[in-house]
């Protein structure tokens, strides 16, 4: 089955702390979550390890967010949109529901 949201899609967060922010999908997990560029960032504290020659400090890490909380972002309308599928000449395409344009 084809997925409606794929890697490198421009998305917008619909609910929660980051509502209204946009970003690109970096990684999608099988449990229905995704890592989105610049969204849901947490700070991790790490001690230095002299054996591995790694310095310690505070590092920022992007955490997964549920795909049910995001929607694909339509650049033409500047709004979140829904996705539907269309088959032309034996090929399946994803298109925006509002204006019928193909998703790149």
Curated annotation (Swiss-Prot):
Pfam families in the record: KOW, ribosomal_L24
GO BP annotations listed: translation
Gene Ontology CC: ribonucleoprotein complex; ribosome
Region (Disordered): 41-61
Highest taxon listed in the record's lineage: Bacteria
Coiled coil (UniProt feature): none
Record keywords: Ribonucleoprotein, Ribosomal protein, RNA-binding, rRNA-binding
Molecular function per GO: rRNA binding; structural constituent of ribosome
Similarity-based family: Belongs to the universal ribosomal protein uL24 family.
Name of the molecule in the record: Large ribosomal subunit protein uL24
Organism (species): Wigglesworthia glossinidia brevipalpis
Lineage of origin: Bacteria, Pseudomonadati, Pseudomonadota, Gammaproteobacteria, Enterobacterales
């Amino acid at each position: 089955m084809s997925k409606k949201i794929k890697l490198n899609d421009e998305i917008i967060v619909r609910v929660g702390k980051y509502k209204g922010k946009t970003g690109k999908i970096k990684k999608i997990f099988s449990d229905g979550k995704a890592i989105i560029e610049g969204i849901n960032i947490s700070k991790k504290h790490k001690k230095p390890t002299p054996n591995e020659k790694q310095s310690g400090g505070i590092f920022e890490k992007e955490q997964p967010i549920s795909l049910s909380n995001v929607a694909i972002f339509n650049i033409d309308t500047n709004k979140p949109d829904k996705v539907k599928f269309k088959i032309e000449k034996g090929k399946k395409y994803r298109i925006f529901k509002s204006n019928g344009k193909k998703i790149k």
